[in-house]
Swiss-Prot record:
GO terms for molecular function: 4 iron, 4 sulfur cluster binding; iron ion binding; NADH dehydrogenase (ubiquinone) activity; quinone binding. The keyword Translocase applies. InterPro entries: NADH_UbQ_OxRdtase-like_20kDa, NADH_UQ_OxRdtase_20Kd_su. Its EC number is 7.1.1.-. It catalyses: a plastoquinone + NADH + (n+1) H(+)(in) = a plastoquinol + NAD(+) + n H(+)(out); a plastoquinone + NADPH + (n+1) H(+)(in) = a plastoquinol + NADP(+) + n H(+)(out). Keywords: 4Fe-4S, Chloroplast, Iron, Iron-sulfur, Membrane, Metal-binding, NAD, NADP, Plastid, Plastoquinone, Quinone, Thylakoid, Translocase, Transport. GO terms for cellular component: chloroplast thylakoid membrane. This is NAD(P)H-quinone oxidoreductase subunit K, chloroplastic.
Length: 243
């Protein structure tokens, strides 16, 4: 039982018909209305996560047929604008990169450089089987990167050949849930120069030896071991052709 404020006087007494003034009020009190319009009770982590999860700006990195499925999201049928996605052409304005398609050895340095130019915090969605494992090119192709997670850290894996637009939307929703549960202090910032490739790709990290002035620019080079194997294979193939 509550008393409505209009039934009180300055002398802290009730009016003559006060016996009928008591009722169950279904409305919130005047104090609660004032507080809810001026005060937000939350934590810094929740506020920062809330501000980021609904305004993801993706950098579209399409290298194969999977990107055609992502292009379907731009149309009115799926309309990815309702999720706050704003495609950007510059990595310095994006906080999400979607790798769609096969990643080759020559494209690996460019992908890593694009990821480094993105501001923190940043996220990665690996879209398609070719991006995640190399796909059908991983068995007999020495120029295919067998998993983009060997180059850059991946947050969401989206399998499929190719994935449907509905699956892409589901991956974005899962990424938003992951962002909502993050803790700001535990978010690890990627150190400059860190790489995620493994020795399975026979990558070595060297400075540019052609021009001593460009010591700060780094490139990927194929190791001598891999080059030797490829040379022996090509020579053996040519000898068989001559026979």
């Amino acid at each position: 039982m509550v008393l409505n404020f209009k039934f009180f006087t300055c002398e802290n007494s009730l009016e003559d018909n006060s016996t009928t003034m008591l009722k169950n009020s279904i409305e919130s009190s005047f104090i609660n209305k004032t507080l809810t319009n001026s005060i937000i009770l939350t934590t810094f982590n929740d506020f920062s996560n809330w501000a980021r999860l609904s305004s993801l700006w993706p950098l579209l990195y399409g290298t194969s047929c999977c990107f055609i499925e992502f292009a379907s999201l731009i149309g009115s049928r799926f309309d990815f604008d309702r999720y706050g996605l704003v495609p950007r052409s510059s990595p310095r304005q994006a906080d999400l990169i979607i790798t769609a398609g096969t990643v080759t050895m020559k494209m690996a340095p460019s992908l890593v450089r694009l990821y480094e130019q993105m501001p923190e915090p940043k996220y990665v969605i690996a879209m398609g089987a070719c991006t995640i494992t190399g796909g059908m090119f991983s068995t007999d192709s020495y120029t295919t990167v067998r998993g983009v997670d060997k180059l850059i850290p991946v947050d969401i894996y989206l399998p499929g050949c190719p994935p449907k637009p509905e699956a892409i939307i589901d991956a974005i929703i899962k990424l938003r849930k992951k962002i909502a549960q993050e803790i700001y202090e535990e978010k690890k910032i990627l150190k400059k120069g860190t790489r995620f490739f493994t020795l399975n790709h026979q990558f070595n990290f060297f400075s540019n030896l052609d021009n001593p002035k460009l010591t700060s620019s780094n490139q990927f080079f194929q190791s001598k071991k891999t080059s030797k194997v490829l040379l022996e294979t090509s020579l053996t193939f040519k000898e068989k052709e001559n026979l």
